[in-house]
Amino acid sequence: MNTEAAGKRVHVIQGEFKVVNDPHIVLSTILGSCVAACLRDPVTGVGGMNHFLLPGSASSPSSGADATRYGVHLMELLINGLLKQGARRDRLEAKIFGGARTIARFSNVGEQNAAFARRFLMDEGIRIVGESTGGDHGRKLEYWPSSGRARQYALTGVEAQRAMQMDQRPAAPKPVESSIEFF
């Protein structure tokens, strides 16, 4: 039986990351100028995806900027999440998606996002085994972390408008400071 075809879908929205070790899970997202980095350890089958809006980081922690919008924060969270689930850094491999130029009159933040992801992964010694970035259309992405398989669909018309609106909406809400997470 093809476990990928019958997989449980987990959506990753802007400002989030997910780490899984279940071969029946497919991670999915919709990207415009945002970038999703998909990382996995092929030996353990642990993998994950993030979805970030901007490269770099907030200028200062006290500025009130939401760190989950930034690639540097979400890349660190994804890598640390993989390591906590048993992945080894020296075996990690990556695929990068997104970074489209969805609005021609604005600066090309999509290109900056893709360049940031490439540079970050290279600096961390993580091998990039696949990439589909740039262009002027959004993408719908599906990623099977256990196998490393990825599939994307170009978004046009109404779908592209929806992706652009998602890029411009607020990131996932921050957890309440007094909340407790149980493992």
From Swiss-Prot:
It comes from the Bacteria. Gene3D superfamilies: 3.30.1330.200. It holds the Pfam family CheD. It catalyses: L-glutaminyl-[protein] + H2O = L-glutamyl-[protein] + NH4(+). GO terms for molecular function: protein-glutamine glutaminase activity. Its EC number is 3.5.1.44. GO terms for biological process: chemotaxis. It is an enzyme of class 3 (hydrolase). Keywords: Chemotaxis, Hydrolase. The keyword Hydrolase applies. Belongs to the CheD family. PANTHER family: CHEMORECEPTOR GLUTAMINE DEAMIDASE CHED-RELATED. Probably deamidates glutamine residues to glutamate on methyl-accepting chemotaxis receptors (MCPs), playing an important role in chemotaxis. NCBIfam families: PRK13497.1 (NF010019). This is Probable chemoreceptor glutamine deamidase CheD. The gene is cheD.
